Amino acid sequence: MGKNRTIQDIFVVSFGNIVALVANIIIGFILPLILDIENYGYYKTYTLYISYTGLLHFGFVDGILLLFAGKNYDELNREKFRLYTKFFVILESVFGVIGVAGAVAFLNGQMRVIMALVSLNLIWSNLILYFQYISQATSRFKEFAVCKIINAVSTIALVAVLFFIWKKYSNSSLLTAEFYIVASQIISVGLLGWYFVTYRNITFGKKEAFVNEKNTILLILKKGFVLTIAYEVSRLVLVMDRQFVSALFDIETYARYAFAYNILSCVTALITGISTVMFPKLKRMSHDEAMKFFPKGMALITVLVCFAQLGYYPIRHIVMWLLPHYADSLEYFRIVFPVLALTSCITIIVFTFYKILDKNNVFFLVCAVSLVFAFLANVVAYCIWKTPASISWASLISTVFWYLISVLFLSKNYHVQWLKNFAYAMCMVCAFYLTTDFITNEFISIATYLLILIVISVFLYKKDMAEIIKSQKHLSNGEGLRS
């Protein structure tokens, strides 16, 4: 029954992610069409800074996930969780108001507006994250998927309205980054309201006294803080190149650079559902079972991303047809797309294993070292070449370094197998660069990359594929129901 439940959970979350993917595709291509480059650049600056707001939950949501992962929702103490919810609402509201006041008092121009909106967003986004982590911890993946779908459908409707306005009134004052951000935040507030109603049993009503639970709240913060810092440092590694381009180049150059990552996010939206389901499932496994899963999980993610890289070809045509003023973004996209195979392994598989092994402090150190390396690599790239593309290549080098030091600790201490997956990933990275750069005929380029992908995949993962097929036969014959 466990295997079938896991498959169902992955399907439910993946369906929500597919709907989110559709929304990301629409946003990714329509928003830069209806906003001018300057406004799009300001919008992407906003999205860059909201990626840091997770620091301001101070580990509370991660502590909730770590302490309650694997439990059933009915096992949660209602009165205690009502206190946790009230505490977190107050905490985030205080920092949100402080952020808005600071932006108004100390900043000027467009950055004042952007940072004030970032500060407001931290309230909605962190509270939504709190409820999402409760869904994830208690394996209530239906609510998690519904949340994704509501947000995606609402965002699609918003973009559709703006597209209609753009077609009818191309110079409308509504076609600005500020209007879109405010409208998006209204959607977030509505989504938060839905969560309050859905989880009303742990939100409203009689609650435990703070004095009785202050030690538990401190434990939640203590448990989650290191994980949060590790996660945010890892996020800094991921966005280091964008931060450099944002700081060192004009807003239009940054808009084109950020657009490349906007396209990339369409792919990541589809595969992140696996990590959502994985943590509570792995936490229920024995140590040996989890360690055996590691190389298979790494292989699954890498193969999926490598096949997804075939999307580079149609995406290139769509951009050239629909958004020719973003044609420069395609070179950045071509450089960073293969890096996704390595970053996905780190953020989806490796990070999950550090969590279940309770080695968040080690992962923090790994990410801190990687962050320093990434910073130095970007500095060197800019000092020598002074181009956004050189910073993209520096991002590839720093990601390889990050991958190696993060898996070497697991290999040394837990004997996980990783070398085959790394060799596979690097082979496909090289294959992608070679086929997209040196083969001018697109049909031959696609065929060559696909042939290399299939041959290397079968050569390295033939045994793993056979095991997957065998397990599926067992499930279809009913053996999976008895496990």
Regions found by a protein language model. Name each.
Residues 57-73, 260, 264-288, 295-298, ...:
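Helix-loop junctions and terminal segments of transmembrane helices
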Residues 32-39, 105, 109-113, 138-146, ...:
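Membrane-interface helix-loop junctions in multi-pass transport and translocation proteins
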Residues 3, 7, 124-148, 338-369, ...:
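Membrane-interface junctions at transmembrane-helix termini in multi-pass inner-membrane proteins
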